[in-house]
């Protein structure tokens, strides 16, 4: 019984990514990157003049404020950008 319990604990630890980090899309959404530690948000950056085409995507630690020229959209799930 102890062996079974130990086996289940080991399998659980292996299956769970204990050092889990966020995965965010790159500019072309077919490709993504694993974010470094501390950067737990994904973002898209748009030019205000054209809100349909993002000009940059990636990982970030804090969502920047929008400006008169640039709009940011941030999210906190894998590949949400």
Curated annotation (Swiss-Prot):
Keywords per UniProt: Cardiotoxin, Cytolysis, Disulfide bond, Hemolysis, Membrane, Protein kinase inhibitor, Secreted, Signal, Target cell membrane, Target membrane, Toxin
Gene3D superfamilies tied to this protein: CD59
Signal peptide (from-to): 1-21
Disulfide bonds: 24-42, 35-59, 63-74, 75-80
GO CC field: extracellular region; membrane; other organism cell membrane
Record GO terms (molecular function): protein kinase inhibitor activity; toxin activity
Cell compartment(s), UniProt: Secreted; Target cell membrane
Transmembrane segments: none
Pfam families, per database record: Toxin_cobra-type
Biological process according to GO: killing of cells of another organism
Main location: secreted
Expression by tissue: Expressed by the venom gland.
Oligomer and partners: Monomer in solution; Homodimer and oligomer in the presence of negatively charged lipids forming a pore with a size ranging between 20 and 30 Angstroms.
Protein role: Basic protein that bind to cell membrane and depolarizes cardiomyocytes. This cytotoxin also shows lytic activities, but 2-fold more important than that of CTX-A2. It binds to the integrin alpha-V/beta-3 with a moderate affinity. Inhibits protein kinase C. It may interact with sulfatides in the cell membrane, which induces pore formation and cell internalization and is responsible for cytotoxicity in cardiomyocytes. It may also target the mitochondrial membrane and induces mitochondrial swelling and fragmentation.
Protein family membership: Belongs to the three-finger toxin family. Short-chain subfamily. Type IA cytotoxin sub-subfamily.
Protein name per UniProt: Cytotoxin 4
Source organism of this protein record: Naja atra
